[in-house]
Amino acid sequence: MRESLSWIAVTAAAFVMAHAGAVAQTPPAAGGAAAAAAPPVAAAAATPASAPAATSPFTTGKAASGEGKAALCSSCHGPQGNSTNPEWPRLAGQSAVYIAEQLRLFKSGARDNPIMKPLAAALSDQDISDLAVYYEAQTPTGLEADPSYWKAGEALYLSGDSAHSVPACVACHGPVGRGNLAAGYPALRAQQSVYVVKQLNDYASGARYPGPHPEQASRNGVMMLTLAKRLSPEEIRDVASYVQGMR
């Protein structure tokens, strides 16, 4: 009973935070994620996943300046932030607030990555803001969800797993995976599933924030460090495939 009440409390808290000051979400199209009988399959890599998120009011960056500074980033993250390498994250349409936070974490060493750490260390605060705003303004292109795992991933994303005290992902990341600017929750739509699997495993193992106080590294660190440990390898695989196919 205590565990059940704890799960309900976590779900309710996540839902409230996700909707407090949240930007408007675009509802799924007819036959979308909540009602579709078939997985969300992208028409082609060049087809936009959906309109870009509104420019964040929380940064002082300039997208035009960020475009020039993103030339080096594109070698891994792809043109306009649409990475084609499944191990490297897509940045197109990602929250500027979230991107800026992660770059600062890489710069400080609170988040570890042998490639990103030295690159972020060379960035000024203005560089970080410019890059963050630029990538937020880009449009993520569509990817396919694996039909073998999509339905199970949809159920976990939309409803959670009460048996293991896992709240629904939708509460924080939104019905179409746009995230929540005000709360600092990242967009997940059209993200590479291989990358999502790695990040969830890194949360569970503590590798994402390896410092002595990982719960203080990021605003959403406490929640994800806890929840990722409750997910089975199959659940991680399923939900990662589902978000890859989101528009």
Enumerate the language-model features and the residues they cover.
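N-terminal export/targeting leaders of redox proteins
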Residues: 1-60, 104, 233-234, 244-247
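Electrostatic cytochrome c docking/interface patches
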Residues: 28-70, 84-85, 137-163
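Gly/Gly-Pro-rich "capping" loops immediately C-terminal to redox-active cysteine motifs
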Residues: 56, 63, 67, 81-111, ...
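The canonical Cys-X-X-Cys-His
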Residues: 73-80, 131, 166-177, 239
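Inter-heme linker and motif-flanking segments adjacent to c-type heme-binding CXXCH motifs
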Residues: 82-83, 109, 137-148, 156-163, ...
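C-terminal capping alpha-helices of c-type cytochrome domains
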Residues: 121-143, 199, 226-247
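Short amphipathic alpha-helical linker/capping segments at the junctions of internal repeats
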Residues: 125, 149-157, 216-217, 222-225, ...
